Structure formats: C-alpha cells, structure tokens
Design a protein with these regions (language model features):
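Bacterial Sec-dependent N-terminal signal peptides
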Residues: 1-33
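Solvent-exposed, low-complexity segments and loops of surface/extracellular structural proteins
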Residues: 31-37, 41-809
Length: 809
C-alpha cells in the first residue's frame, strides 16, 4: 500500500490526542514531544526509535544543572510536575465567554524543587486541589465573595500567603510548621483565617506563626475551627510578625493562647485578643511601634509583658497587681487603662512581694473612663510611688452624668509637670465632668507647681465635646502646690474651675480655640492670674485678695473684679471689665490699674464710686463706660486722666436717681439708654461746648419711661432704636443748643412734654422711623421742617413752634 494512503492506527490516534493535551506542559518540562510520544505509545519507525534512543542517551549523560521553570494552569484538569513557579490565574472558559479560575479541586501540582511557588487567584468559594511539595502558596481572593483554600489533600507546604481585594480570605487544613502570612488587605471589613488540622494542634504546646504586611482588615483567626468570624483554638504559643506596611488587626483570634510573641518592624496595632488566659506578652523583638489591647488578661492572670524598642502601648481594662510584671522596654511607652462601662472604681499601683515596683520602663500612665449608665462615674486612684519610671499622666473622662474623679497621689515634680486631661465627646452635662486631685510626694518647697493640658475636642462617640467642666484641686496636705499651669488644646470651649484655697501664687492658662468660650465655675484667688496667651473668650470672677494681678488674651473677655488692689490688663479684642463699688477703688491708697488693652473695651461699673482723678485715673484704654450704679452717680469724664478715648456712655440702672456725665470730650459721641433707665434723670454735658456737637442716642430700653434727659450742648441728635420692642418714653427733654433731631428705627420715641430751651430747633426728621414718634417743639422760635415716615403705619405726632413750620409725611 502506498505510504501516502496509509490510515493511522488506533494507537497513533490516541497518541495524537494525548500529545495535544500535554504539549505545553511537556515543552515546559524540557522533554521533546517526540520522545514523550514514543514513551507513551511506542513506534514502528526504526529510524525514529534509533534517533530517540540516541537523544535519550545524550540527555541522561548531561551534567547541566536544571533551571527552574514557569508553569501555567489551564481551564481543564491539570496535572503538573516541575521545579519553579506555577501560575494559577484567571483564564477564559472553554467557550471563551467567561473568566474562570484555572486551579480546580481536581488539579494536581507537584513541586520537584526546594523552593517551589504557586500563585493562585480565586474568585470566591472553596477549592481543595492536591499540592505536593510546593513550598510557598500565594492565595489571593480577587472579588467580594469569600474564598477558602483547603490544604487537606496537600503536603510539603511551609508558607501560605493570603491576600484579598475585598472578600474574606482563608486557608483550611493547615498542618504543623506552616507559617501563615497575610498581606495587602486594605478593606476594614475583610477577615483572614488559618484553620489548622486536629493533628496540628494536639498537645499543650502547639505553636503557630502569623506574619502580616499591610493588613488593615478586621479579624485574623488562627487554630482549629478558625473561620472568618470564628476564633481559632488549640494554639498555646502564637507568634505575630509584622513588617512592610502598617498593620491594624481588630481582633487576633486564637482563644487558647497563653503566650503571645510580637516581632514588629512596622507600626502594628492589635485592638483585641480572643484569648483570656494570656500570661506572657513578649514584644521585645519589635523595633516598630506596637499597640496591644489585652483587655482583662492583666487582671485575670499573673501577667508578664515586655515591650520592644519602639513607642509601645499596652492597653488593659484594669490596674495591675503585685504578681504582674510590666516592662515597657526601650522607647517612650504607655500603659493605658480603659475600663469597661460596667467596671467599678480603679486603683492603680501595687508592689511585688519584695516591695519592689512591678512596673518598669513605662513612661506614660493613661487612664480612661466610659459612661457606666448609672449615678456614679468610674473613678481612678493612683499611687505614683509604685510607678517611678512614669514621666507623664494622661486622663480621659467619659461619664455623661457624673464627674470622673482622678486622684493622683505621691507625684514627683516631673510627673506633676506633665498631666493631660481629655473628654470622650459626651457634650454638656449638668455637673463637673472631671475632677483632678493633684497630690505631690514632696511639697515642702515654696515654688511647687503642676501643669495640665486639657483637650476639649476628643469625641470617641462622634459627639463633639464642648463646654466640658474640669475642676483642678490640690489634694496635698495644706494645699502646698503654689502654682498651676493649664494649657488648653482642641477646638471646643471649656469650663475651668479650681479650688478656692489652692494654687495661691499663680494660675497660668494658655491656648484655647478662637471664638470658643473659657468660663469658670469658681472665683480665682491666685495672686497672679495670667491668661494673656489664651485665644478663647474668657469669663471669670476675681477673688477678694488684697492684691491680685490679672492678664487676659486675644479673645472677647469678660472679667468680674472684686475688692482689693487689682492690676488688670485685658489684652486684645473687645473686652469687658465689670467692677463694683469696692472694685474700682475709693481711697487714695488704692493702687488699682485697669487697662483695657487693644480693641473696643467696656468698663462696666455696677456701684457708686468716688468721682475723682485719684480713683478714675487707674483706668486706661477703654472705649465704653457703662454706668449701672443702682443710685445717683455723677462722673466727670476729665477725671479719667489716663483714658481720654471714651466714645460711648451706656446708662443703666440708677435706682430712680440721676446719672450725670460731665466734661465729655468731643470723641464721646454715643449715649445708649438701657432698660434700667426707667424713672431716672440723665444729664450729659460737654467739656467744650462747640457749635457742632453731635450725639447719637441708642435706645435698648424694652419699653421704659425716663423722667428727664438733659443734653444742652448738642446741636445734632441722632436717635435710633435697636429693635421694635425698644420703646422709649422721655417725659422731659432739655436741649438749649438743639437744631436737628433725626429719628430712626422700629421702636417708639415719645417725648411727652415740649422740648425745653429748644429755641433753635429747625429740623425734626422721622422719615427713617417705622415706630411711633411724638415730638413737641413748642419752644422753637425758628421755622421748622418736620418729616414723618409716609410709608409706615407708625403715628407721627408733632407740635410746631412760633414760626412758619412745614410738616410732611
């Protein structure tokens, strides 16, 4: 038969199909297709057989070192063997319509080298392939659906690396000696887990290792029964390695662990451990900063902690006992007590059986309370004798109903100089929110001090903290701390109080947020109160010390003075100084000094005072004088020998008496009538009576009737009411020089009697008034023009004089 017409035998047909299926794998393995075919099904071609034999002989005697290769899995059933890297990525389906996983449960991959790797991409779901001798398995979940790699059918694996873009990722069937790595998980809701076999966790000394790199997901669970939302079990010693990028683990779940080792070269946070029997937490191998929350383990167990060389924080929900050992290691380390809402009061401080400190190399003690939902807050008492290495104390109050009390006893000078207090964002409460009692170990000196920084913007519960109250007291015997410095931080206001008999030498306050308030719940009896570096709006009351100096800052401040010799500097902005009869000084011996500073400042006098240059000469740099004497008072403006810049007088309560303002300068051009003016007589006169004096009268009376107003030196009077409710009635107005009366605003102005002595009045203009106006100009001897508001419903009642007058409106 002609060779060209020869039909292929059955064996040849089988070989052709087999070759097509395995061609790629065969080429990757370095075996010729011809040799593979012949080895599979033989040949009746002597020439080929001879050639193949020769080729095989040459290959067998070669001394070339095998080179690791790369193998790609397909969309079919794969059985691959070789040394190198196996790629099990997403591939097209047989029909070419969908992307599917190339690694399936029926696939077998055998690594023949010593460092074989398989890279697996999973689109969700569980797979259980057979992986033999592949040392490193990289398993990545590419979608939102959780994916699990089951290694029950596999062996020879030393490392499993888990990663995910979204969905939970895990591995099951993990045997003894397998390190689990978790990396590149940036979704905060993603979990990772390593479910170990029952054989792997036999005994009481099972160890497991988890390495993280850039994990910022939720849980990492390790051990038998571990799943995305289930803690593992059966592991007694768990080692956590952290490197590369920052990692933050919400919960490290291995419930049976008694020893935790942390080796972190990068910043690492573990917010919770599911294990409740931890006796050893060893982070001495860490060089990066660690934050580890062991919750109740310190209180429940004899607990030993060793920190690393970074800035470490150990978090517990209780204090420590004499059988514990807390060593922060190198770096600036913190022991943070964050109690549960159901906890009782906390006592911090204990010594070992040998009366030695059980805490060392910890620089900051941090204490935080939560709202316990009851009538009493959780209080802290700490004996700093038992924490000699601590150089700073931090507190945070969180109860919404009752003040959290912090008793800081036996502090040394360094500790007393580095105290901080914050709030948990609980908003305004009816009582004091935090009370801090400061106690020094040695307060025998004459210049003992304490410094506390208060932050009013911490908001763990997402509610902005504002106007929280902090009461700072000296609990040292005989109140021996002479000076207190309070630094205000944050963006919210604060209410600051101190015990009346404490910090007698000085109180210094700095900081604060602009446009926020700094108020006080107590009088300040410190010899010096320095708030010159405060940006907030200050309101406080001075004490009755014989001598006191007060400085305020750049906010709009209101200071209430008291008896004694006071030196006051209100700094920048528009400030108000309120002082009574005793406050402004009534004797030559008084050495007060009231300096309004920059801005438009107000001196508010609430009592009667001696009208003399000796008394009023203590005032400088005020622009407004508010008279509220509750009785008859005369003030000669020229007696303000150091304050010629007054521009406004506010007349308030004179108890039905008379307020007389004499010798007003030309710059004093505004007279405000407050509602206390009812039943009073007000007299305003100039130091120099020029031909063009102008006075603005601003009414804020809320319906008041004044008995009389005398303004004899004013040619032009511009009257205005602040609001429709500011209705003013003046029984008698006397104004000898008055030529023009302009009336505006929504409130009524009713001048009951004819304006006395007003022979020169020629213009009454009420066109800008929307309230009722009543003016009787009977005494004018010149032709007048009177204008009402024609567009308003307000009543304009006018009486002209003896000349030819024009009335419109």
């Amino acid at each position: 038969m002609d060779a060209s017409n020869k039909q292929p035998t059955l064996a040849e047909k089988f070989a052709a199909v087999w070759e097509k299926k395995n061609a790629r794998a065969a080429r990757a393995g370095g075996v010729s297709l011809m040799a593979l075919s012949l080895a599979a099904c033989g040949s009746d071609d002597d020439t080929v057989a001879t050639t193949t034999a020769a080729t095989t002989t040459a290959t067998d005697t070669s001394t070339t070192t095998p080179v690791a290769s790369s193998f790609d899995l397909t969309n079919g059933t794969d059985t691959l063997s070789g040394a190198g890297t196996f790629n099990a990525g997403m591939v097209w389906s047989p029909g070419g319509t969908d992307r599917i996983e190339s690694l399936q449960s029926e696939d077998t991959v055998t690594g023949t080298g010593t460092a074989d790797i398989i890279n697996i991409t999973n689109n969700g779901g569980a797979i259980a392939p057979k992986l033999i001798g592949v040392e490193t398995v990289n398993f990545n979940v590419a979608g939102a659906t959780a994916g699990t790699l089951n290694l029950s059918n596999s062996s020879g694996i030393t490392t499993v690396a888990l990663s995910s873009t979204d969905g939970d990722v895990g591995v099951s069937g993990v045997g003894t000696g397998v390190e689990v790595k978790v990396a590149g998980i940036a979704d905060a809701s993603t979990n990772a887990f390593a479910n170990m076999t029952a054989t792997a966790v036999l005994g009481s000394a099972t160890a497991a290792t988890v390495s993280v790199d850039g994990f910022v997901g939720t849980n990492i669970n390790v051990g038998s029964s571990a799943a995305a939302g289930v803690s593992g079990a059966g592991v007694e010693t768990l080692t956590l390695n952290s490197s590369g990028e920052v990692s933050s683990i919400a919960s490290l779940g291995s419930s049976g662990a008694t020893t935790i080792n942390v080796n972190a070269s990068q910043t690492t946070t573990v917010s919770a451990f599911t294990a409740t029997g931890i006796t050893t937490l060893d982070a001495s191998g860490s060089t990066g900063s660690t934050t580890l929350n062991v919750a109740a383990n310190v209180n429940a167990n004899d607990f030993a902690y060793t920190g690393g060389s970074g800035t470490d924080t150990l978090i517990a929900n209780s204090g420590f006992t004499g059988t514990d050992n807390l060593n922060g290691g190198d770096g600036a380390d913190t022991f943070s007590i964050r109690v549960l809402s159901t906890s009782g009061d906390v006592t911090v401080g204990a010594l070992s059986a040998a009366s030695a400190a059980v805490v060392s190399n910890i620089e900051t003690l941090d204490m935080r309370s939560l709202d316990n939902g009851g009538a009493n807050a959780i209080d802290f008492t700490v004996d700093m004798d038992h924490m000699p290495g601590v150089t700073a104390l931090s507190m945070r109050a969180g109860d919404t109903g009752t003040a959290t009390v912090f008793n800081l006893n036996d502090m040394n000078a360094t500790q007393a100089g580095a105290i901080s207090l914050g709030f948990n964002g609980t908003g305004n409460t009816t009582g004091t929110d935090a009370t801090v009692n400061l106690g020094l170990k040695d307060a025998s000196g004459t210049a003992d001090s304490a410094t506390i920084t208060i932050t009013a913007s911490i908001d763990d519960d997402a509610t902005p903290a504002s106007n929280q109250t902090a009461l700072i007291q000296d609990s040292t015997t005989n109140n021996a701390i002479e000076s207190l410095t309070v630094n205000l931080a944050g963006t919210k206001g604060i209410i600051l109080s101190t015990e009346a008999a404490t910090f007698g030498t000085s109180l210094t306050v700095t900081g604060g947020a602009a446009d926020q308030s700094l108020t006080t719940g107590t009088t300040f009896n410190n010899t010096t109160v320095d708030m010159s570096a405060v940006a907030s709006n200050i309101t406080f009351t001075m004490g009755t010390l014989a001598t006191q100096t007060v400085k305020t800052g750049s906010g709009a401040d209101t200071i209430n003075a008291a008896a004694g010799s006071k030196t006051i500097d209100l700094g920048a902005n528009d400030d108000t100084l309120v002082t009574g009869t005793a406050g402004i000084g009534n004797a030559v011996a008084n050495v007060d000094s009231f300096n309004g500073g920059d801005g438009a400042d107000t001196l508010h006098v609430t009592g009667t005072f001696t009208d003399s240059g000796t008394v009023l000469g203590v005032v400088s740099n005020f622009e407004t004088l508010r008279l509220d004497p509750a009785g008859t008072q005369a003030v000669t403006m020229s007696n303000f020998i150091n304050n010629a810049g007054f521009t406004k007088i506010i007349v308030d309560d004179a108890g039905g008496g008379t307020i007389t303002v004499n010798n007003a300068s030309s710059s004093l051009n505004t007279l405000r009538l407050e509602d206390g003016v009812a039943g009073e007589t007000v007299v305003f006169g100039r130091l120099v009576d020029t031909a063009d004096n102008t006075l603005a009268i601003d009414s804020r009376t809320a319906t008041a009737t004044a008995t009389a107003l005398t303004i004899n030196n004013e040619e032009i009077v511009n009257y205005s009411s602040n609001a429709a409710a500011d209705d003013t009635t003046i029984t008698t107005v006397t104004s000898a020089d008055l030529t023009t009366l302009n009336i505006s605003g929504a409130g009524d102005l009713l001048i009951t009697n004819a304006i006395a002595s007003s022979t020169k009045l020629k213009t009454v203009d009420a066109s800008a008034s929307t309230g009722g106006v009543e003016v009787h100009a009977n005494n004018s001897a010149v032709a007048m023009t009177a204008t009402g508001n024609s567009a308003s419903a307000g009543v304009f009642e006018f009486t002209g004089g003896s000349a030819a007058d024009t009335i419109t409106g």
